Amino acid sequence: MLEKDVVFLRPDPDVTLTVPSSAKIPIGVGGMDQKSGILYLDSGRGNTIASVVKPDFVAPAVGVQAIGRLGNYVTLTGTSAASAIAAGACAQIMEWGNSRGRRLLLNSVQIGNILIRGCERNPDVSYPNTAWGYGKMNVYDALMKFYGV
């Protein structure tokens, strides 16, 4: 059925990053099921070729409620939903950094580092790792740690 020169590679679930999360600078967002607390199985995993930890962290990716283009509620699943949530968190941190006279002009690397500092981590898991990155994104904790509270 197959040609004799066809071979199958040994699959490795820890080498499944795709562009743009495989690049150095962009924030790589993995996915998790926020109800069960487990990793979203279709979430890409693994460090970059330059051994940069990716994903940076995980965000909700299963059963995410959103507003559809017709104004109706829709349910989304996938790391695109997780990335949208993380993008909203980045915008929130940018706004926070520039409000109330702070005038902090934060770049994407700084915002990513702020979010990483606030990640929730399971004490039984070693971080960073190729599945969870630095943990579960927690914007409130990130801002509290950044602000020194």
Q: PLM features: what roles do these ranges have?
A:
Residues 2-24, 30-53, 66-77, 99-101, ...:
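Active-site-adjacent substrate-recognition loops and nearby beta-strands
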Residues 127-149:
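C-terminal domain-closing interface element
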